[in-house]
Every structure is written in structure tokens, then in C-alpha cells.
């Protein structure tokens, strides 16, 4: 009985390679997503779906160009059109990544039943050769009347991981929830 408890506890442990900052960032980002969604915010996957659709169209264009019935000299104009379309669609995809996504790890809808808040854009940064993890919460609709001010948390990742690379979820959870609460307090209050 005791062994089963230990096994189930070990399965839920999030462990990172402390020498790999990508591994650390991935575990922290995954935990942030879990925390935010547990607070009643549902994930908005529209941007991800748009990127997938664009990527699929790009692949279809490349496949059509590759396996078109006619051989090269005869299909020259068609190939030029496919190449141009491929470049344009990739440029659109990169533009979306650069302007909309940036460092975002999670887009959310407003909490259900809430008429006074917008969804969230949660973004994070862990620069190379640095231990400073920056977590930012912004409004998904910054032009909205009910958009809150951006809040930010910057801390050393060494405060959340043991020397074995295990994430101390309680400490991290507390810091992220405090940031979410801080954002909720920053939201503009309705005038009566």
C-alpha cells in the first residue's frame, strides 16, 4: 500500500535537467498553463488552429508543386506560382508568430460568467545563460475598457527547483496565483 502511494507521487513529480534551460522553461510554462486554467480561464486555441491551417495549406502547396503531372519545362509557370504562394504563405505565418504570439505560452477566454474582464495572454521569458524567469500576464484585448494593466514576475528559477531538478510546485503555484490575483486587482473597476 505504501509503495503505491510513492509510485503515484513520483509520477506527478515534474523533473527538469538543470543544465538545459529549454527543459526548465518547458516545465515552468506547462505548470503556468495548468495553474491559469485551474483558475477558471479556458484556453483559446484559435490562433493555434489558424497556424495549423496555414501550415497545412503550405504543405499542400509544396506537395502539389512536387507531384504535378507535367515535367519541368512544361510546368514552369505553375511551379513559379507555387513557389510564390509558398513564400507568401510562410511570410504570413511568420508575421502572425512575430506580431500576435511573441513569447506567449497561453491565450485564454474570459472566465465564464464574467462581463468585466478580458481573456489573458500569458507570456514567459528565460534568456539563455540566465536563471531569471519572467512571467507576464496581459489582457487578451488591450483596447477593451475592461483590460487590466500588465503584471510581471521575475524570479530566479533556483527558488522553484531542488538541486535534483524537481519542481517545488507549491512555491511556484503560490507565486503564479499571486500574480494572477495581482492582475485581477489591476483590472479597472466599474463606475457606479
From Swiss-Prot:
UniProt superkingdom: Eukaryota
Record localization: Endoplasmic reticulum membrane
Cytoplasmic membrane side: 1-46, 99-192
GO biological process: signal peptide processing
Topology in membrane: Multi-pass membrane protein
TM helices/strands, residue ranges: 47-69, 79-98
The entry's keywords: Endoplasmic reticulum, Membrane, Transmembrane, Transmembrane helix
Keyword Transcription regulation: no
InterPro entries named among the record's database cross-references: Spc2/SPCS2
Cellular compartments per GO CC: endoplasmic reticulum; signal peptidase complex
Main location: endoplasmic reticulum
Topology Lumenal: residue spans: 70-78
Pfam families found in the cross-reference section: SPC25
PANTHER family named among the record's database cross-references: MICROSOMAL SIGNAL PEPTIDASE 25 KDA SUBUNIT, SIGNAL PEPTIDASE COMPLEX SUBUNIT 2
Quaternary structure (record): Component of the signal peptidase complex (SPC) composed of a catalytic subunit SEC11 and three accessory subunits SPCS1, SPCS2 and SPCS3. The complex induces a local thinning of the ER membrane which is used to measure the length of the signal peptide (SP) h-region of protein substrates. This ensures the selectivity of the complex towards h-regions shorter than 18-20 amino acids.
The protein's role, per its UniProt record: Component of the signal peptidase complex (SPC) which catalyzes the cleavage of N-terminal signal sequences from nascent proteins as they are translocated into the lumen of the endoplasmic reticulum. Enhances the enzymatic activity of SPC and facilitates the interactions between different components of the translocation site.
Family, per entry: Belongs to the SPCS2 family.
Protein name listed in UniProt: Signal peptidase complex subunit 2
Source organism of the structure: Arabidopsis thaliana (Mouse-ear cress)
Amino acid at each position: 500500500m505504501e509503495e503505491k502511494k510513492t509510485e503515484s507521487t513520483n509520477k506527478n513529480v515534474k523533473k527538469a535537467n538543470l543544465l538545459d534551460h529549454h527543459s526548465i522553461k518547458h516545465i515552468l510554462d506547462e505548470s503556468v498553463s495548468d495553474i491559469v486554467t485551474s483558475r477558471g480561464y479556458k484556453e483559446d486555441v484559435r490562433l493555434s488552429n489558424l497556424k495549423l491551417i496555414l501550415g497545412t495549406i503550405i504543405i499542400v502547396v509544396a506537395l502539389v508543386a512536387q507531384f504535378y503531372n507535367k515535367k519541368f519545362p512544361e510546368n514552369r509557370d505553375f511551379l513559379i506560382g507555387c513557389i510564390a504562394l509558398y513564400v507568401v504563405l510562410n511570410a504570413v505565418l511568420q508575421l502572425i508568430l512575430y506580431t500576435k504570439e511573441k513569447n506567449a505560452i497561453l491565450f485564454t477566454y474570459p472566465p465564464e460568467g464574467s462581463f468585466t474582464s478580458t481573456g489573458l495572454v500569458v507570456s514567459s521569458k528565460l534568456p539563455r545563460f540566465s536563471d531569471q524567469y519572467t512571467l507576464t500576464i496581459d489582457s487578451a484585448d488591450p483596447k477593451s475598457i475592461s483590460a487590466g494593466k500588465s503584471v510581471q514576475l521575475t524570479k530566479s528559477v533556483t527558488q522553484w527547483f531542488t538541486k535534483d531538478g524537481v519542481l517545488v510546485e507549491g512555491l511556484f503555484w503560490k507565486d503564479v496565483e499571486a500574480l494572477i490575483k495581482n492582475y485581477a486587482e489591476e483590472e479597472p473597476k466599474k463606475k457606479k
